[in-house]
Amino acid sequence: MAIKIYRPTSPGRRHHSVSSFEEITKSRPERALLVSVKNDSGRNNQGRVTVRHRGGGSKTQIRVIDFKRNKLDVPGRVAAIEYDPNRTARIALVFYTDGEKRYILAPSDLKVGDVIMAGENAEPKSGNALPLSSIPTGTFIHNIEIIKGKGGIMVRSAGAAAQLMAKEDDYALVRLPSGEMRKVRSDCSATVGQIGNIEHGTLEIGKAGRNRHLGWRPTVRGSAMSPNNHPHGGGECRCPIGMTGPKTPWGKPALGYRTRKAKYSDKLIVKRRG
């Protein structure tokens, strides 16, 4: 993927960059793999805001992605590399020999015409999905399962890759992109390779309207609010927040305060991120 930079014909264009989309080979998605979902604008089933600053944006259709890679020992040919408006990674349309079509996350070096497969007998090459026990140590992987058969939930964004560091007994040691070292059961599957669209992190939004198209609404400063809406609010004109350190809208310390909840799977974390 290459980055396209515009001439500074306006303040928005001056700091504006987009993907060249040169790796995209098909513009229209596969209709059988589309699902329409209503935009919830950050609300839950009670209508309350659970994620701030979300809403609006371009209307999109969900592409049904095969995160489980449970079509075992059936080879498939990559028919197209497509753009997905709902994620940062590119997706690949795969035609399997039994006639089924599926979308998968596209690794960086996957090309149209490549043949991929999932299963214990698959070769550990880019795009193939295997159990961690069948993947050589040191291999870069993505779309990693935590529970066997549930589908990959880790390392799915553009340019991301984890590394298989070691295998011992029933567990494999994986280094995640955040630096966290985590144990994962060896019978869980992962896909070999690094996810494509590697330069996505270097894109510059450039203007507020582009964020609105992506479904992000403005972030209002707490000091600009009234005191009943934010701990920093109130006062006449510009004034200090009136406390020793900044707070979240719910009164918790905003800097350095641990917010990660304890989970049963925390015992599998060998080394924390950072």
From Swiss-Prot:
Which key words are in the record?
Answer: Ribonucleoprotein, Ribosomal protein, RNA-binding, rRNA-binding
* GO CC annotation: large ribosomal subunit
**Lineage: superkingdom:** Bacteria
Under the heading InterPro entries, the entry gives: NA-bd_OB-fold (IPR012340), Rib_uL2_dom2 (IPR014722), Ribosomal_uL2 (IPR002171), Ribosomal_uL2_bac/org-type (IPR005880), Ribosomal_uL2_C (IPR022669), Ribosomal_uL2_dom3 (IPR014726), Ribosomal_uL2_RNA-bd_dom (IPR022666), Translation_prot_SH3-like_sf (IPR008991)
A molecular function (GO) held by this record is: rRNA binding
Q: Which GO terms describe its biological process?
A: cytoplasmic translation
Could you tell me which residues belong to the region Disordered? 1-23
Its quaternary organisation is: Part of the 50S ribosomal subunit. Forms a bridge to the 30S subunit in the 70S ribosome.
Its function?
One of the primary rRNA binding proteins. Required for association of the 30S and 50S subunits to form the 70S ribosome, for tRNA binding and peptide bond formation. It has been suggested to have peptidyltransferase activity; this is somewhat controversial. Makes several contacts with the 16S rRNA in the 70S ribosome.
Q: In which family does this protein belong, per the annotation? A: Belongs to the universal ribosomal protein uL2 family.
Q: In its UniProt entry, what is this protein called? A: Large ribosomal subunit protein uL2
- This protein's species is Dehalococcoides mccartyi (strain ATCC BAA-2100 / JCM 16839 / KCTC 5957 / BAV1)
